[in-house]
Each structure stands twice: as structure tokens, then as C-alpha cells.
Amino acid sequence: MAKRSKAYLAAAEKIDADKLYSPLQAAKLAKETSSTKMDATVEVAVRLGVDPRKADQMVRGTVNLPHGTGKTARVIVFAVGEKAAEAEAAGADVVGAEDLIERIQGGWVDFDAAIATPDQMAKVGRIARVLGPRGLMPNPKTGTVTADVTKAVNDIKGGKINFRVDKQANLHFVIGKASFDDEKLVENYGAALDEILRAKPSSAKGRYVKKITVSTTTGPGIPVDPNRTRNLLEDAADA
């Protein structure tokens, strides 16, 4: 196990590991316990009661965070002709087809999201082994395989995020930066949680949301009450 810094250990002492915090309390604590002087990213990890090995229990989806992520996503688009021009006009960072595929085959993955027009998907399939494990493979279910490239680029640049359960039944997503107001972090958290609850597979049995942890990228995890799904901003007095 990696040795923790003094700043991390001091931050961890502020957290009661046996307590389940409200989302608002967790947002405040995450900002207080960030162990970096930079504007840290605030992240959420959710453990779900599903079996990802079963196709009918794969949880995935998208959510437009009301306050964005605090980061302008770097977006690439696989398109040609008129659709390529539309993607460039919408603000896509890199647009291409064969040339872009070859660049990625060469090891370049410096982007946060990938969009493709339907006619390009057969070609993009050649780099599925590169994009898939990174959660970057365009998919119709997340709106990233589409003819409306303008909307897709604008959505992602505006704070749209994807979530997908991993092999351990965990979801990871960003809700903002430590510089965000507490309320904005909580509202982003609530928007994402709502979508995750809506994505519950009908075949999932027992408790769906088992565990939630909030942290900054370099800070300690803060356990959040998974039963708190409504009225998330009510804890101002005791947070």
C-alpha cells in the first residue's frame, strides 16, 4: 500500500469512518480535506447491488450536470464531409476519420469523449479495444453515435457525463471542483444520483445502492448515506 502524505493523514482524521454523512456534509468535508493546493476535482464512487456479468444488469447512462464539471471536456468526432464541418463549428477539438483512427492506433488518447456519426462506426470498431476499456467508445445509448454532432458536442462541452458500472459493480463520476459552492456540488450529485436510480435494472434484486463515497482526487473518502435521495440541501444547519 502506498505511503500516505502527512496532509492526507491529517485530512483523514477529520472524517468519522463509522458515520454516514449527508451529501451536503460530504461536499463541505471533501473541500476541507483536499490534500492539494490546486483546484481539486470532486468525485463520487457508488457501489451497486448488481451483477455486471449479467447483460441485463449492466448499468450505464448519461446525465447533464446542472453546473457542469468545472472542466471543459476535450471532444473528438469521427465524421466526414458536412458532418465534419458541423462538428468543427460546434467546437469539437479534433475531427477526422481514417487519419484520427490511425492517430489513436498510434497511442494518442488525449481526449475526454468521442463522438461518431453512424456511417463511421464500422471503421471506429477497429479501435474498440483502445477506446472501450477507457470508457471512450461511442455508443448510441449515450448519445455519442449520432448524426446530430452539433448537439452531441454541445452537450458534452456543457457538462454531460457518462456513467457505467465496472466489473466490481462500482460507478465513478465527477460532480465538480473544490472551488464550487457546496450547493452546486450537491445539485450535481443529486442530478447524477437521480439518473442512476432511474437506470436500475428490473432484474436487480435486493439493495440497489449499497455504498456511496465522496472525495477529491487526492483526498480521503467520505461515506455518504445512500438512503438520502431527496431534499439533499436540507442539512445547512448541521453540516
Swiss-Prot record:
One of its GO terms (cellular component) is large ribosomal subunit. The keyword Lipoprotein does not apply. Coiled coil: none annotated. CDD domains: Ribosomal_L1. Gene3D superfamilies: 3.30.190.20, 3.40.50.790. The keyword Membrane does not apply. GO terms for biological process: regulation of translation; translation. GO terms for molecular function: rRNA binding; structural constituent of ribosome; tRNA binding. Part of the 50S ribosomal subunit. Belongs to the universal ribosomal protein uL1 family. Binds directly to 23S rRNA. The L1 stalk is quite mobile in the ribosome, and is involved in E site tRNA release. This is Large ribosomal subunit protein uL1.
